[in-house]
Every structure is written in structure tokens, then in C-alpha cells.
From Swiss-Prot:
One annotated Gene Ontology cellular component of this protein: cytoplasm
Pfam family, one: PrmA
Gene that encodes it: prmA
The organism's taxonomic lineage, starting at the top: Bacteria, Bacillati, Bacillota, Bacillota incertae sedis, Caldicellulosiruptorales
Protein task: Methylates ribosomal protein L11.
UniProt organism field: Caldicellulosiruptor saccharolyticus (strain ATCC 43494 / DSM 8903 / Tp8T 6331)
Keyword Transferase: yes
Name by which UniProt lists this protein: Ribosomal protein L11 methyltransferase
Amino acid sequence: MKWFEVAIKTVEEAEDAISNILYDLGANGVVIEDDEILKYPNSWDYIDENQFPKRNFAVVRAYFPESVNISELIFNIEERLKDASQYLNIGEGKIDISEVDEKDWANEWKKYYKPVEIGNIVIVPSWESYPNTKDKTVIKLDPGMAFGTGTHESTMLCLEAVQKYIKPGFDVIDIGTGSGILAIAAKKLGANRVLAVDIDDVAVKVARENAALNNVEIEIKQNDLVFGIEEKFDIAIANIIADIIIKLAKDIKNVLKEYGLFISSGIIEDRLDDVIKSFKENLLEVVEVKKLNNWCLVVARK
């Protein structure tokens, strides 16, 4: 069997949005080529950087069965990219199509996904074994088609922050939960009630599976950000993108208790000032800003 490989030339900030678009349109698998992977502290023992010429773009590759109507698919991709470009820098957005031989795209990436430690938390792929240890919080994870493996800088920053700010008994909401990794971490760190929401039904399904895998009780539901949520929480977490965080700044106080914290990440460094400005305009006190490579985390207090 042959597959169509759709390669889109983009920028790092748009990788996740474009990946989601391609999955929505029926991709059986997505691969991201990005120089930022060379910066992951736990991914490599040694790198000869001369073997990796620096590029200022990323490539998202998706794989579709040969039975797909390729003309219709390209049209739909172009339309979705046009829509995405209204709120996100997608870079060049050039689309290349080629035919490739059959491969197990859904499982190939698992060979490269290994346990990763962030502070006292260890993210362990569901198919890997890891020794039980009292001084580490182990989270078993199978991200499937949902964002959040623990290796992305924005997720690392969030995992460091939840360890710093979440106290036993806190109520926590995770907005745009993806794989459920941050909600699961919150529960394992002693949070009382944890609500995880995502607009994507695939993410909701994956998050529920990962919660069951970790034997934690988390309420997970499909929802558009905080729309319609009336409960109050000690901490709100959003690892999304800058534009959505800026949009959230107007409403986040409605779901926070007095002096509650908003932990936000997924912010590219070029958009950091915009996020901080939106927080100040909405009377949120910025209490911490942290950077990892060119990704940023901002913690604000109600």
C-alpha cells in the first residue's frame, strides 16, 4: 500500500496547530521536523551540530492513505491554513505532496519517546517499564494523537510550575488538557478536585485513557476554554498558544478563587510582552516569568 505524504513548511509556533489540522482532515500520522529538538536536555547524549545545518523553519509531515481524494485534501488544507493564518504566524505555508511506501506511522515515533524527568516528576511512556521510587512522581503516558508528551519546552515549564505552586487540597482546572499530562500531574501532587477541558474530542478521549492508566480521578470534558464554567479554582493552567492565552486573560478571573493563580505557557518569546500586557490590562498581577529556549511561562495572580 502507498501513502500520500503531505509536507507543510511552517514555523515552530504553528507546529501544533498545523498538526491538529492534518489530524482533523484524516491523517494517519504526523511527524515534525524542527531544529528545536536538538535543544532538549534529555533527548541526546551528544550532538555534532555541524551535522545539523540551522534552519529558520519547521516541516510538518502527515500521511494519508492512497484512497484519499488528493485534490480535495489539498484544497481543504489550504483553506484551513488560510483560516489559521488569521490568528497565528504559519510561516511560508508551502505544501508539497509525494507518494511513499507503507509504514506503521502510528507507532514509529514510539522508538524515540523515552522516560523524561522534570524535577521530581518522571514521564514514562505506557509501553516502557520504570522502577517505582518514593522520591519521584511517576506519570504513565500514551499521548496518542493529543499534544503533551512532556518533552516540549512549554510542557516542561508547566510541569516545573505545578510542582512549585500546587499544594495538597487545591482545586485545579487544566484548560486545553491535550494528553491530560498536566491534570494528572496536579492530581498526583495532591490536588483535591481537578477539572480538565479541551475543545477537541480526540484529546478528551486520550486524556481519559491516560487518567485511567494512572489510576487518578479527574473530571475530563469537552469544552471551549472556560465558557460556561461556574466553579472557582485555586489554580488554572493553560499550555496553549499566546493568542488563546490573551483571549483567556479577560475571563480567567471568573474561574479563579481570590488570589488564585493562572499558570500559562506555550508562549513563543516574541509574544511574551503581548501576554504580559493583556494580564496587566485585565488586572492580573504577574508573579513569575520563566523561559526555556525561546518558549515562555507566565504565572499571574488574581
